[in-house]
């Protein structure tokens, strides 16, 4: 499971001219699901994101998490995070999970964030969406559950 996490002052997602999800300060999370992802990937990523300290404290240091700030999350499913551009000029998305697998895992991810007490808004799975955001910082982090399981390199 792969997430592009953007710290925002506000973000919204629109489908067919209607705003379907919007937040104030918090995180916009673009979420992609891989063919091999499981509930373990959901739990790992949700826990890491909820506790990730990427908000500044009074001294300007990254010491606060989404939980600490009381911010919200806007979760938008995005299969294109698994684009393979190694061959040709048109990306392949064969690594992305099929919708019948991905949709329940995205729903479970949003539920997992809510269990931490985080207010969560969402896009519409599989819809053509327009995402608007004001990136704060900017702070943008890419996180992948497969990489989180790898051992850290020794210095």
Swiss-Prot record:
A Gly-cisPro motif from one monomer fits into the active site of the other monomer to allow specific chiral rejection of L-amino acids. Its EC number is 3.1.1.96. GO terms for cellular component: cytoplasm. Homodimer. Keywords: Cytoplasm, Hydrolase, RNA-binding, tRNA-binding. GO terms for biological process: D-amino acid catabolic process. This is D-aminoacyl-tRNA deacylase. The keyword Chloroplast does not apply. The keyword Hydrolase applies. It is an enzyme of class 3 (hydrolase). It is found in: Cytoplasm. Pfam families: Tyr_Deacylase. InterPro entries: Daa-tRNA_deacyls_DTD, DTD-like_sf. An aminoacyl-tRNA editing enzyme that deacylates mischarged D-aminoacyl-tRNAs. Also deacylates mischarged glycyl-tRNA(Ala), protecting cells against glycine mischarging by AlaRS. Acts via tRNA-based rather than protein-based catalysis; rejects L-amino acids rather than detecting D-amino acids in the active site. By recycling D-aminoacyl-tRNA to D-amino acids and free tRNA molecules, this enzyme counteracts the toxicity associated with the formation of D-aminoacyl-tRNA entities in vivo and helps enforce protein L-homochirality. It comes from Chloroflexus aggregans (strain MD-66 / DSM 9485). A motif (Gly-cisPro motif, important for rejection of L-amino acids) lies at residues 137-138. It catalyses: glycyl-tRNA(Ala) + H2O = tRNA(Ala) + glycine + H(+); a D-aminoacyl-tRNA + H2O = a tRNA + a D-alpha-amino acid + H(+).
């Amino acid at each position: 499971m792969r997430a592009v996490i953007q710290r925002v002052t506000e973000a919204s997602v629109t489908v067919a001219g209607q705003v379907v999800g919007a937040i104030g300060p918090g995180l916009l999370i673009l979420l992609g699901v891989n063919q091999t992802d499981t509930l373990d990937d959901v739990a790992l990523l949700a826990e890491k994101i909820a506790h990730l300290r990427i908000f500044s404290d009074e001294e300007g240091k990254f010491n606060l998490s989404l939980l600490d700030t009381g911010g919200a999350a806007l979760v938008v499913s995005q299969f294109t995070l698994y684009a393979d551009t190694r061959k040709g000029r048109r990306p392949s998305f064969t690594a992305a999970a099929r919708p019948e697998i991905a949709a329940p895992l995205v729903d479970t991810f949003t539920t997992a964030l809510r269990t931490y007490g985080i207010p969560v808004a969402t896009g519409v799975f599989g819809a053509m969406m327009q995402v608007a955001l004001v990136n704060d910082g900017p702070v943008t982090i890419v996180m992948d559950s497969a990489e989180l399981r790898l051992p850290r390199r020794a210095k």
